[in-house]
Regions:
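Short, solvent-exposed beta-strand edge segments and adjacent coil->beta transition regions
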Residues: 156-158
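Intein/HINT protein-splicing elements and their conserved insertion hotspots or analogous self-processing inserts
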Residues: 3-153, 165-248
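Short hydrophobic/aromatic beta-strand micro-patches
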Residues: 160-164
Length: 248
């Protein structure tokens, strides 16, 4: 029941260009990335990153790295022109357990929003959910000061689930049943005032308006869109970031 349209592109990604009379090239690491499609019986049950503004909800981190927060190959490491010593990895049994957890949560309609933790780590995952839902977010990290960067920017496998407060216990019980009891933690709640606040027990890291952060996040894409697409349309889309309506 699964269709795989392509799987070879990631095995041969290479780009070549001329710079100052010399040929330059970048060849991507050889790693198989497969895209797949499956039938969807009811599009109304599809999980998206669009955060609900309901304050009687919680955001739960399902951390398949189980707190290791390895930074190798992360965007943050590359920003500092490093690769890191230890890269994230996964345990096969945990992937199966994660699938079972999410499937049961979805079947029971416990999940309001879902986003995988990927490029940029946990902080970017949370911000993208807030941006999509046009709402604020209160993030509380239970880590020491020397662990903050790793917790926010590690790209360990995992996901963030938004669930109604009344179903948090259900998710935790299900996680324990599939062997992920120590991998699920409550990480954040929505804010109605549109502010993004990130705290640790020791100090406040971020306190900013959602739209201010989203304008920074979208700045590069906006600049590209003005060149590639219709500039007026790109400007209109960029200006709409300040609006509170998340759209369809």
């Amino acid at each position: 029941g699964i269709t795989i349209p392509v799987g070879k592109d990631s095995m041969s990604m290479r780009t070549v260009w001329q710079e100052e009379g010399e040929e330059r090239a970048v060849t991507a690491p050889v790693s198989l990335i497969v895209s797949a499609f499956a039938a969807c019986d009811d599009v109304r049950t599809v999980l998206t990153p669009v955060l609900s503004p309901r304050e009687d909800t919680a955001l739960l981190l399902v951390d398949l790295g189980r707190g290791q927060d390895r930074m190798g190959g992360s965007v943050l490491a590359q920003v500092w022109q490093q690769m890191g010593n230890s890269a994230p990895d996964v345990v096969t049994e945990d992937i199966r357990a994660f699938f079972e957890l999410v499937k049961k949560a979805k079947d029971n309609e416990w999940v309001l929003a879902y986003h995988d933790r990927s490029d940029g780590g946990l902080l970017v995952t949370l911000l993208e959910m807030a941006f999509a839902g046009r709402c604020g977010l209160q993030v509380d990290l239970e880590v020491s000061p020397d662990q903050v960067n790793a917790r926010l920017f590690s790209e360990e496998a995992g996901a963030v689930l938004q669930v109604a407060t009344e179903h948090v216990a259900d998710i935790l019980a299900c996680a324990a049943a599939v062997g992920l009891g120590d991998a699920v933690t409550r990480i954040a709640t929505p804010r109605a005032d549109g502010r993004i606040v990130v705290n640790t027990p020791q100090f406040e890291l971020i306190d900013s308006r959602r739209e201010a952060l989203q304008l920074l996040w979208a700045e590069t894409s906006h600049a590209i869109a003005r060149v590639r697409d219709n500039a007026d349309c790109a400007d209109q889309e960029f200006a709409a970031i300040g609006e509170q309506d998340p759209g369809l």
